[in-house]
């Protein structure tokens, strides 16, 4: 079984010493009552990091116009839980945050990357 993925998976041993994963687990221990290895929880945490980025860039101007300006002008933004090298890029005509990923294969125990970082449309 193969798939494509763009983020670090906190359930996998290879990421246990990663500073971003350690920070995520510390946050989860304090604020999250569910399973911190759950992919939905990790995804929510990543979305919250993106929202924090946007709000910081907006500063005191939280108008819809300014929020949309920031959201649609992200250039090479890296978030801690994204797979190394994955960058977020958006524009006024392309809201899709990233087209970068690695191919992963299930080895019977966990998903293992088997390609370098790829870019696709």
Per-range role (PLM):
Residues 18-22, 65, 112:
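Generic alpha-helical secondary structure signal
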Residues 30-42, 52-111:
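Segments of small-molecule ligand-sensing domains
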Residues 1-43, 117-119:
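Extracellular/periplasmic periplasmic-binding protein-like sensory domains
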Residues 109-121:
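Tryptophan-rich aromatic "cage" segments
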């Amino acid at each position: 079984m193969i798939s494509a993925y763009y983020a670090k998976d906190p359930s996998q041993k290879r990421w246990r010493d990663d500073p971003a994963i350690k920070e995520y687990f510390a946050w989860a221990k304090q604020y999250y009552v569910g399973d911190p290895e759950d992919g939905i929880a990790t995804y929510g945490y990543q979305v919250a990091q993106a929202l924090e980025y946007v709000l910081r860039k907006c500063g005191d101007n939280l108008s819809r116009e300014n929020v949309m300006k920031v959201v649609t002008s992200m250039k090479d933004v890296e978030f801690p839980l994204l797979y190394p090298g994955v960058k977020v890029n958006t524009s006024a005509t392309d809201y899709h945050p990233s087209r970068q990923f690695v191919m992963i294969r299930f080895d019977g125990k966990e998903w293992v990357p088997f390609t370098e970082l790829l870019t696709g449309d």
